[in-house]
Amino acid sequence: MLKNKILATTLSVSLLAPLANPLLENAKAANDTEEIGKGSDIEIIKRTEDKTSNKWGVTQNIQFDFVKDKKYNKDALILKMQGFISSRTTYYNYKKTNHVKAMRWPFQYNIGLKTNDKYVSLINYLPKNKIESTNVSQTLGYNIGGNFQSAPSLGGNGSFNYSKSISYTQQNYVSEVEQQNSKSVLWGVKANSFATESGQKSAFDSDLFVGYKPHSKDPRDYFVPDSELPPLVQSGFNPSFIATVSHEKGSSDTSEFEITYGRNMDVTHAIKRSTHYGNSYLDGHRVHNAFVNRNYTVKYEVNWKTHEIKVKGQN
């Protein structure tokens, strides 16, 4: 398990000074102090928390950016959710049979944020809507007075006093918001379509990933080699998502947030069959959402006064 770490950074931002290039954002998160401009209209106080679960094959790297704005009548917090979700793709004999092999693989990756605090409201998040592009890059910007806006790419930050960016790769998958309200947001990164040797196939195709070696005893050989699998199936997914929340000043000192990373798994069966002439071939069969919500959830406590982050529980 990765060692928990608390990272504190205070930024002084003037009304006129925009944030420096967000492409360097991840590196800057490791610095002790960063100052921009000479004023102190905004303070950005940063904390980082890492949690890993070997049981679920998940690492959460969460950046908590407290926005202290003298011209905003609420507390604000930007949560950037990064880390790694292992694919947990596995191959095995189906019910100890010799002619049916199975491949369990992630049809969907789940990323979610939730709070039950009545004084906290979700005010912005990234990504929004449905995104089909392989490479996703977006920026959330902040201006004095509590104004959060999103920009389509890493270069769209020039007019912001402070900004936070996301960037991730989702080859053969699409991102979309599945649920969203004032207390929560849930994203699904879902399998879409795949280029195969026999042409383009839908993520729901029963023969997807079925291979060409019906005489092998190894379950792995019943399916296509690693070179034909996209990274999100072969290894896993590196999320990069943002949610921004507001908190009523003078209400509760602390709030709790549940952050969830996980996956929904499909199972593809490769069944050895024979033609009338005795030739063997593999036939595919799919079980969609065979294992759902295989999720790792961590409960974080945020202190609005001291800006401390505590882990209150995990499954």
Curated annotation (Swiss-Prot):
GO cellular component annotations of the record: extracellular region
Q: Which SUPFAM superfamilies match?
A: Leukocidin-like (SSF56959)
A GO BP entry: cytolysis in another organism
Q: Which domain of life is it from?
A: Bacteria
Keyword DNA damage in record = no
Stored Gene3D superfamilies:
Leukocidin/porin MspA
- The positions making up the signal sequence are 1-29
The terms under GO molecular function for this entry are: toxin activity
Pfam families reported for this sequence? Leukocidin (PF07968)
Question: Is Signal set as a keyword in this record?
Answer: yes
Q: List the disulfide bonds.
A: none
Q: Which residues form a coiled coil?
A: none
| Record keywords, A-Z | Cytolysis, Hemolysis, Signal, Toxin, Virulence
**What is its quaternary makeup?**
Toxicity requires sequential binding and synergistic association of a class S and a class F component which form heterooligomeric complexes. HlgC (class S) associates with HlgB (class F) thus forming an CB toxin.
- Provide the function of this protein: Toxin that seems to act by forming pores in the membrane of the cell. Has a hemolytic and a leucotoxic activity.
Protein family membership: Belongs to the aerolysin family.
- Can you name this protein? Gamma-hemolysin component C
User: What organism does the record attribute this protein to?
Assistant: Staphylococcus aureus (strain MSSA476)
* The encoding gene: hlgC
